[in-house]
């Protein structure tokens, strides 16, 4: 069963992509949806089996890398964190597949689209279920490639190609640092397996853990669109709306958050990394929600809303509330997917127009879409008893409940971000459905609700957006919940704040976000309905023009990057190419050698002037040249021969001298021994005579 969860989306992708002509358009849609729906059912079964029974499953397929000091296995694990991530990934994916049947019904390349969607789901499952950092990185790169393919699906659009390239290159920055972090893990621990790395984490130098954590955080910043590496996410809205719902709301953008949660046994031992996460999430929340307030494209507003909620998740990670972070991740996937699919239904109804200012009065034509977008928006602003309320407010309470200077400041900053979230949510609902009609007559003549393929996913996600948070809050954030006792996440005992959050936060600070949400919702509706002239008059002033332009142009971050980073790198690359590739390398190499030969041949050919005396001079010079060469060679060889002969003679003389010395020594030794022997004999005779 567990292996089927991994394999089925890949089979669906292969059939739709390589055999699309054989099975046809309808066949590719049916097979793609069936494979994902079957996988979703199996994932729900695994959620109950693994999560509630605390029975982690491990699957070893085969060895990938095998050396003396480093072994890597294709190993997949299903623990409580994995099955929790599989639920939003596969539920949203199956609903998006079903939704795409109606949304992409008139597209001539729907087989390719369904193949890309199934391949993305497969790569996301690899990322979530991998049992080591290298296998996780395979899925990490896979979802990046699939995102590139899906954003540029309509490749005849220049904006789509630019957006996909921007997403691809921006994520390369994060991937580079993630790779560096993996190298540091391998250098310091000798392994990339989760169990080995996490079991040795308490015994490593904190500075090394900080370096690893910062590298992992930068990788997560790019994938989860945090401030600094966020520019690709709003541009990625050029892709089809189902792609935005699947990739850029529910699954791929949460991969960075998942990476940090999975690495909790590592980063818990570095307070520096946690503090950076805390402030990074706070800045991202306010930054993105403030930009979203000044956007006019409905999909870009929802994209900046996604970025803001990802900042909330990073705040929870900085507070060491990993269970709250994963809970908010799952809740956010459902209501943000609903927002994107609802926006897709609106865009589909008004002939692909995405400008809010050309909507208005659509509540009469799209009552179901209005209802589901209202439900999703209420969940987004954490209205009481909606799904988002149980996780988003708990993050804010956790920030105040830690009782540190940084966390209390982050509480107020994130609350301001929540207020801006309320404002642009009301803006979307009001300008789209409640305001006076501002669009073309053709919009309203042709506006209609979608078919069953567009409507059913909206209803299902609306049910999730209402009830899922209430039904699962005790599983993820309840006191004494044993859902994560299989050590899939780790919270250091010194940083455990669940009880402080539940019982130590004053009631006023628990209710403050709710009161601000209600107050600013009413204020914004009154403002738009009864005082629109004030907004127009302010925008027409110089101050209003500059303020609106600054926020509408996203704090001029893209302008800064293009002017000071992109242009600098391009100039540096151009100069490098000019000096090295086009310069020294080619001058030393074939280009310069060819030019030298051509010039030499022209010089030689220019010597033929037809003057006899010049020719005689050339002959004389040539003869002298050849004579000098031969003379040098003869002298050189004579000198060499003389040296060789002298060396031979010297060696022979030395050899003879050594031999003569040896013979003389031998003769002297023989004479001495004979003389001594004869004297000994005579002495013995004389001694004998005396004795007689």
Curated annotation (Swiss-Prot):
Gene Ontology cellular component list: mitochondrial inner membrane
Top-rank taxon: Eukaryota
GO biological process: ATP synthesis coupled electron transport; electron transport coupled proton transport
EC code(s) of this entry: 7.1.1.2
Reactions mediated catalytically: a ubiquinone + NADH + 5 H(+)(in) = a ubiquinol + NAD(+) + 4 H(+)(out)
Record field: transmembrane: 5-23, 30-52, 81-103, 112-129, 133-155, 168-190, 200-222, 243-262, 272-294, 301-319, 329-351, 364-386, 409-431, 452-471, 511-528, 535-557, 615-637
Subcellular location: Mitochondrion inner membrane
Any GO MF annotation of the entry: NADH dehydrogenase (ubiquinone) activity
Pfam families: Proton_antipo_M, Proton_antipo_N
Main location: mitochondrion
Swiss-Prot/TrEMBL keywords: Electron transport, Membrane, Mitochondrion, Mitochondrion inner membrane, NAD, Respiratory chain, Translocase, Transmembrane, Transmembrane helix, Transport, Ubiquinone
InterPro entries tied to this protein: NADHpl_OxRdtase_5_subgr (IPR018393), ND/Mrp_TM (IPR001750), NU5C-like (IPR003945), Proton_antipo_N (IPR001516)
Record's bilayer topology term: Multi-pass membrane protein
Physiological role: Core subunit of the mitochondrial membrane respiratory chain NADH dehydrogenase (Complex I) that is believed to belong to the minimal assembly required for catalysis. Complex I functions in the transfer of electrons from NADH to the respiratory chain. The immediate electron acceptor for the enzyme is believed to be ubiquinone.
PANTHER family cross-referenced by the UniProt entry: NADH-UBIQUINONE OXIDOREDUCTASE CHAIN 5
Record-stated family: Belongs to the complex I subunit 5 family.
Descriptive protein name: NADH-ubiquinone oxidoreductase chain 5
Organism: Hypocrea jecorina (Trichoderma reesei)
């Amino acid at each position: 069963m567990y292996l089927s969860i991994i394999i089925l989306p890949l089979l669906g992708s292969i059939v739709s992509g390589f055999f699309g002509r054989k099975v046809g358009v309808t066949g590719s849609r049916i097979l793609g949806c069936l494979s994902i729906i079957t996988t979703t059912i199996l994932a729900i079964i695994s959620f109950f089996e693994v999560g509630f029974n605390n029975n982690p499953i491990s699957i070893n397929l085969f060895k990938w890398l095998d050396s003396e000091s480093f072994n890597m296995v294709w190993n997949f694990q299903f623990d409580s964190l994995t099955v929790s991530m599989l639920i939003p990934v596969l539920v949203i994916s199956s609903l998006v597949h079903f939704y795409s049947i109606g949304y992409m019904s008139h597209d001539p390349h729907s087989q390719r689209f369904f193949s890309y969607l199934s391949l993305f789901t497969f790569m996301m499952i690899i990322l979530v279920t991998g049992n080591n950092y290298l296998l996780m990185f395979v899925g990490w790169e896979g979802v990046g490639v699939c995102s590139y393919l899906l954003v540029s699906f309509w490749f005849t659009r220049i904006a789509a190609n630019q957006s996909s390239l921007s997403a691809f290159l921006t994520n390369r920055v994060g991937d580079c640092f993630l790779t560096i972090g993996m190298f540091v893990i391998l250098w310091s621990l000798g392994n990339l397996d989760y169990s080995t790395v996490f079991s040795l984490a308490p015994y490593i130098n904190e500075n090394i853990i900080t370096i690893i954590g910062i590298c992992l955080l930068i990788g997560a910043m790019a994938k989860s669109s945090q401030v600094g590496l966020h520019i690709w996410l709003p541009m990625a809205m050029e892709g089809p709306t189902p792609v935005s719902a699947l990739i850029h709301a529910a699954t791929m953008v949460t991969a960075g958050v998942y990476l940090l949660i999975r690495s909790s046994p590592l980063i818990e031992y570095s307070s520096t990394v946690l503090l950076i996460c805390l402030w990074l999430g706070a800045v991202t929340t306010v930054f993105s929600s403030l930009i979203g307030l000044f956007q006019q494209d409905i999909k870009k507003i929802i994209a900046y809303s996604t970025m803001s909620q990802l900042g909330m998740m990073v705040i929870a990670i900085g507070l060491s509330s990993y269970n709250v972070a994963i809970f908010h991740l799952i809740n956010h996937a459902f209501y943000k997917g609903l927002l994107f699919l609802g926006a897709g239904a609106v865009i589909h109804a008004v002939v692909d127009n995405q400008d809010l200012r050309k909507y208005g009065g659509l509540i009469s034509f799209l009552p179901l879409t209005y209802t589901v977008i209202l439900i999703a928006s209420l969940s987004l602003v954490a209205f009481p008893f909606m799904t988002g309320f149980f996780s988003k407010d708990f993050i804010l309470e956790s920030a105040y409940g830690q009782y540190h200077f940084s966390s209390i400041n982050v509480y107020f900053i994130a609350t301001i971000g929540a207020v801006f979230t309320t404002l642009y949510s009301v803006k979307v609902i009001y300008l789209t459905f409640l305001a006076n009609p501002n669009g073309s007559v053709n919009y309203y003549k042709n506006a209609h609700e979608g078919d069953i393929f567009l409507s059913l996913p909206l209803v299902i996600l609306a049910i999730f957006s209402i009830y899922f948070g209430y039904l699962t809050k005790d599983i993820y954030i309840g006191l004494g919940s044993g859902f994560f006792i299989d050590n899939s996440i780790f919270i250091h005992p010194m940083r455990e704040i669940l009880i402080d959050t539940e019982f130590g936060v004053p009631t006023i600070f628990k209710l403050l976000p709710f009161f601000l949400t209600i107050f600013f919702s009413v204020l914004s509706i009154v403002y738009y309905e009864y005082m629109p002239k004030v907004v127009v008059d302010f925008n027409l002033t110089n101050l209003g023009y500059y303020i609106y332009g600054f926020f509408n142009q996203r704090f001029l971050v893209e302008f800064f990057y293009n002017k000071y980073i992109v242009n600098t790198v391009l100039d540096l690359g151009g100069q490098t190419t000019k000096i090295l590739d086009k310069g020294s390398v080619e001058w030393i190499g074939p280009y310069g050698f060819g030019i030298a030969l051509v010039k030499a041949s022209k010089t030689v050919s220019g010597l033929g002037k037809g003057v006899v005396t010049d020719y005689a001079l050339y002959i004389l010079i040539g003869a002298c040249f050849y004579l000098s060469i031969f003379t040098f060679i003869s002298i050189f060889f004579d000198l060499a021969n003389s040296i060789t002969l002298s060396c031979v003679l010297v060696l022979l003389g030395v050899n003879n001298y050594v031999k003569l010395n040896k013979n003389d020594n031998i003769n002297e030794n023989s004479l001495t021994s004979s003389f001594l022997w004869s004297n000994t004999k005579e002495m013995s005779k004389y001694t004998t005579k005396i004795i007689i």
